[in-house]
Amino acid sequence: MSSSLAGVRTRVRIPLAFADGYSTTAQAVTFDGLEDGREHVALILGDPDLGAATPLVRLHSECLTGDVFGSARCDCGPQLRESVERIAETGGVLLYLRQEGRDIGLYNKLDAYALQDDGLDTYQANTALGFDEDARDYTAAAQMLTALGVGELDLLTNNPDKVRQLTALGVTVRDTVPTGVHANPGNLRYLRAKAEHTGHTIRLVG
């Protein structure tokens, strides 16, 4: 279990409207006492009974370029859009984690992009800058789930490390539900690196 307890700070309902016309309503939840001190937020979608049901949960790391600007260098924006709708259909939680660039920060991520343009893959670029291949720690995510009363969940992810970390932190992952594969010419190298290097469950054609 996570090393300390966090508590719910605020709950507020937010209408969500996406550029493709999809809309829904989320309950945004903020927290006090998160171990890393960051302003992570949970979006509760579909009015689940979190204490009784096994909700569908997505851990989504912040990606300004993909989530906001629609960058085609990654699949983050389409994954976020897909996750909101799928979770709203079944009831569950999307944790929006402030971990830009696999937790190296925005400017460093853009530096890594420049190295990728010179031929490195996404993981090689991070290590060339002196960072871990993936610096993300999900202790705060486990704290958030505990504060929401979620002990068992189905995890919407292609990333086996999220399953490993949550399990080690005392969260029961009943099932792993893969996201779709959002490939385009701009992100094929990125997706292939994730599949080949870190075992993401991504099936690419060609």
Language model features: what each stretch is:
Residues 1-206:
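Catalytic domains of riboflavin
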